[in-house]
Amino acid sequence: MFIKICGIKTPEELEIVENYGNATGVILECVSKRRIGFETAKNLVNLANIPVFAVSTTSDVSVWENIIELTGTNYLQMHSDIDQKAIDFIKNEYGCFIMKSFKIPEKSESPENDAQKIISDIESYEVDRILLDTGKGCGQTHDHRISQILAKKFDIVLAGGLDPDNVLKIVKTVKPFGVDVSSGVENNNSKDEELIKRFCENVKSVKL
């Protein structure tokens, strides 16, 4: 199963993540305690042996162009209502792999109805990968009855409040293509190797 460990800030964190995960991410151009500058991000992209996603909440094409040109990444993770025309421009101009986030409510009165609305939203986009999250890196779990429905229709990457203690049960329930974690493998705002190791071992133990 695909494992992305997001929100790295240093070469030391990158090295830890590379030992366990398939991809990582750097937070740019948004409000986050994990946000880093372009130079730091470029250095991490250059050092990395795994894909480094540039993660941002911007819907401004010119900002995405800056991110791509100043970091050198080919992987983008979009947490905004950016339109398909803008995505097409970025894909045609730069050839980037794009993962688009879709928000799932924390609690649903009608999982089937909510899932159908989100399916319509997803189907209005053409992107390389679909990320299901509770919010913009809020670290809270969402209603997995919805993501379970979506995972039957799309290859989804699941995010939102995952940690070493809950990921096994959640992955068995939702059956996603992959998972994305950040705060759930941190200690004192830094990536913790023991938490990352436990998280990845639990994910990899699941046979879907």
From Swiss-Prot:
Keyword Cytoplasm assigned: no
Family annotation (HAMAP family): PRAI
BP GO annotations: L-tryptophan biosynthetic process
Pathway in which this enzyme or protein is active: Amino-acid biosynthesis; L-tryptophan biosynthesis; L-tryptophan from chorismate: step 3/5
The entry's keywords: Amino-acid biosynthesis, Aromatic amino acid biosynthesis, Isomerase, Tryptophan biosynthesis
GO molecular function: phosphoribosylanthranilate isomerase activity
Gene this chain is encoded by: trpF
Record InterPro entries: Aldolase_TIM, PRAI_dom, RibuloseP-bd_barrel, TrpF_fam
EC number: 5.3.1.24
Gene3D superfamilies listed in its UniProt record: Aldolase class I (3.20.20.70)
Catalytic activity as recorded in UniProt: N-(5-phospho-beta-D-ribosyl)anthranilate = 1-(2-carboxyphenylamino)-1-deoxy-D-ribulose 5-phosphate
Family: Belongs to the TrpF family.
Pfam families found in the cross-reference section: PRAI (PF00697)
Highest taxon, organism lineage: Archaea
PANTHER family: N-(5'-PHOSPHORIBOSYL)ANTHRANILATE ISOMERASE (PTHR42894:SF1)
Transmembrane segments: none
Name of the protein in question: N-(5'-phosphoribosyl)anthranilate isomerase
